[in-house]
Curated annotation (Swiss-Prot):
Physiological role: Catalyzes the ATP-dependent 2-thiolation of cytidine in position 32 of tRNA, to form 2-thiocytidine (s(2)C32). The sulfur atoms are provided by the cysteine/cysteine desulfurase (IscS) system.
Name of this protein: tRNA-cytidine(32) 2-sulfurtransferase
E.C. designation(s): 2.8.1.-
Entry superkingdom: Bacteria
Stored Pfam families: ATP_bind_3
Cellular localisation: Cytoplasm
Cofactor binding annotation: Binds 1 [4Fe-4S] cluster per subunit. The cluster is chelated by three Cys residues, the fourth Fe has a free coordination site that may bind a sulfur atom transferred from the persulfide of IscS.
InterPro entries: Rossmann-like_a/b/a_fold, TilS/TtcA_N, tRNA_Cyd_32_2_STrfase, tRNA_thiolation_TtcA_Ctu1
Misc: The thiolation reaction likely consists of two steps: a first activation step by ATP to form an adenylated intermediate of the target base of tRNA, and a second nucleophilic substitution step of the sulfur (S) atom supplied by the hydrosulfide attached to the Fe-S cluster.
Locus of motif PP-loop motif: 47-52
GO molecular function, one term: magnesium ion binding
Length: 310
């Protein structure tokens, strides 16, 4: 076997392994949150980025072996950004035989008109997109709207809300839409961004960059993303542990009086789950919760250097 054939064989092996992991992650998220049910018509929101391409690919793959029958329709919102390659998505989706709809709305013009030069456009752009996608879901008879946010997006949102909003609020894997008419799901909720990026590169998806918001410097989310990437590189398992913490909340050991009745604690009250930590320190496991090395090398642990968040 030639060296080129050997490399190709190894690349295919790694791609298969990566796809299986993504399939497993998506399958577990779907099962844990009951994202997809018998007869569902899933509107897959396709932006032309690595995340939405990967979501569509994995859902199509799972569709062949899922215990329930569901259909997919891909939807792209053409926001009329200058230089947007309108032909790429229709050609790609047609080649796959996937049902799709391209929605043309000049949200780019609205955002540029309303937002002063130098200010971030994400908030207004997101609101405009959301309303259009809800309307489109109704027109298509979709029962679920699938978005391509992954585990890293969810953690970034948690830290954004803690650092800047004073709230412990993330990005739910499943929720009711703002208009109360649609269920929104995030099938990639358990998937790592670095897995998605590697999968996207290996598959050669025709990526379309977002010129509206992707090039804005010093976004708060980008600062948080850089911090998390740094932690992931230097402290293997930290990201997994933090995400695991979002799934293991103990309201009695936080400070939110809406979540737990602290005033109702009296002599003779029942002991709450979580234990008594008034005098004893909680035992912390040596290995991070939820972390498995998989194929990632584990560099030596380092002392924490606190990053400055502005």
């Amino acid at each position: 076997m030639s060296e080129i054939q050997e490399i190709s064989k190894k690349e295919q092996y790694n791609l298969n392994k990566l796809q299986k992991r993504l399939r497993r992650n998506v399958g577990e998220a779907i099962a844990d949150y009951n994202m997809i049910e018998e007869g569902d018509r899933i509107m897959v929101c396709l932006s032309g980025g690595k995340d939405s391409y990967t979501m569509l690919e994995i859902l199509r793959n799972l569709q062949q072996s899922a215990p329930v029958n569901f259909s997919l329709v891909a939807v792209n919102l053409d926001q009329k950004q200058p230089g947007f390659p309108e032909h790429i998505l229709p050609e790609y989706l047609s080649s796959l035989g996937v049902e799709y709809k391209i929605v043309e709305e000049n949200t780019y013009g609205i955002v540029k008109e309303k937002i002063p030069e130098g200010k971030t456009t994400c908030s207004l752009c997101s609101r405009l997109r959301r309303g259009i996608l809800y309307r489109t879901a109704t027109e298509l008879g979709a029962t679920k709207i699938a978005l391509g946010h992954h585990r890293d997006d969810i953690l970034q949102t948690l830290f954004l809300n803690m650092f800047y909003g004073g709230k412990m609020k993330g990005m739910p894997p499943k929720l009711m839409s703002d208009d109360g008419k649609h269920i929104v799901i995030r099938p990639l909720a358990y998937c790592r961004e670095k897995d998605i990026e590697r999968f996207s590169q290996a598959k050669g998806f025709p990526i379309i960059p977002c010129n509206l918001c992707g090039s804005q410097p010093n976004l708060q989310r980008q600062v948080i993303a850089d911090m998390l990437r740094d932690w992931d590189k230097r402290y293997p398992g930290r990201i997994e542990t933090m995400f695991s913490a979002m799934q293991n909340v103990v309201p009695s050991h936080l400070c939110d009086t809406e979540l737990f009745d602290f005033k109702g604690i009296h002599h003779g009250s029942e002991v709450v789950n979580g234990g008594d930590l008034a005098f004893d320190r909680e035992e912390i496991p040596m290995m991070p919760a939820g972390w498995t090395p998989e194929d990632d090398a584990a560099p030596p642990m380092q002392r924490l250097d606190v990053l400055e968040i502005k």
